[in-house]
Amino acid sequence: MKRRAYISEVPFDEAGSDDRNIYLTFDDGPNPHCTGQILDVLAEHRVPATFFVLGGHVKDHPDLVRRVAAEGHLVANHTMTHPDLTACDSEAIEREIKETNEAIVSACPQVAVQHIRRYGAWNADVLSRSMNAGLRPVHWSIDPRDWSRPGVDSIVDAVLAAARPGAIVLLHDGCPPDEIGNCKLTGLRDQTLSALLAIIPALHSRGFSLRSLPQ
């Protein structure tokens, strides 16, 4: 499949299986209609996670990024405007990476950005420029396609069926800037939120620990 043509080169598809750790990750935020509710659930269950934030959204909602960091979660780079980096020239790739890092650090000076993820599409140029910026490329191993709103049970079942030590779960706490006009913002990620309320205790009951990505 084209979007995974270079996935064997991405060093972080899973995060190791020595311990029974699973890593919840959230893309496309911060979003004032979603992120705070996700954070509330994570706080209730004392679960740390990793948030791959869009630089443009960070500029619009720096308070939410500060809350993410203050509550012990990892803040990571999801590019500035959500392009397919494999379709960008080298200058655009570097700009997307650099401006997002700058937006994050401007909002949260204490944050050291160490990870990047975008689209699941990678090529040699994107990988090298990400790593040259000091960022570790991250993919995922469980994708319940929560962004498509398939139903709460579908999201829960997809995660639990594929759960294994070291798994990286892809979820969403917002939507890309080019889709906001077509999104119903209120309740945008209500299925993700409801699924999370079931996923966390179910994984704990199976003996898994939930962590933010290793640094």
UniProtKB/Swiss-Prot annotation:
Task: List GO terms (cellular component aspect).
Answer: cytoplasm; membrane
Domain (NodB homology): residue spans on this chain: 20-211
User: Where does this protein reside within or beyond the cell?
Assistant: Cytoplasm
Q: Where does a divalent metal cation bind?
A: 78, 82
Give a GO biological-process term.
carbohydrate metabolic process
Give the InterPro entries listed for this entry. Glyco_hydro/deAcase_b/a-brl, NODB_dom, Nodulat_NodB, Polysacc_deacetylase_ArnD
Q: What is its main location?
A: cytoplasm
- Gene3D superfamilies cross-referenced by the UniProt entry: Glycoside hydrolase/deacetylase
Gene Ontology molecular function: hydrolase activity, acting on carbon-nitrogen (but not peptide) bonds; metal ion binding
User: Known EC number(s)?
Assistant: 3.5.1.-
Highest taxon above the source species: Bacteria
Q: Does the record's keyword annotation contain Amino-acid biosynthesis?
A: no
Q: Which PROSITE patterns has this protein been placed in?
A: NODB
SUPFAM superfamilies registered for this protein in UniProt: Glycoside hydrolase/deacetylase
Signal sequence: where?
none
State the similarity comment. Answer: Belongs to the polysaccharide deacetylase family.
- The protein's role, per its UniProt record: Is involved in generating a small heat-stable compound (Nod), an acylated oligomer of N-acetylglucosamine, that stimulates mitosis in various plant protoplasts.
Protein's UniProt name: Chitooligosaccharide deacetylase
**From what organism does this protein derive?**
Rhizobium leguminosarum bv. trifolii
Per the record, the gene is nodB
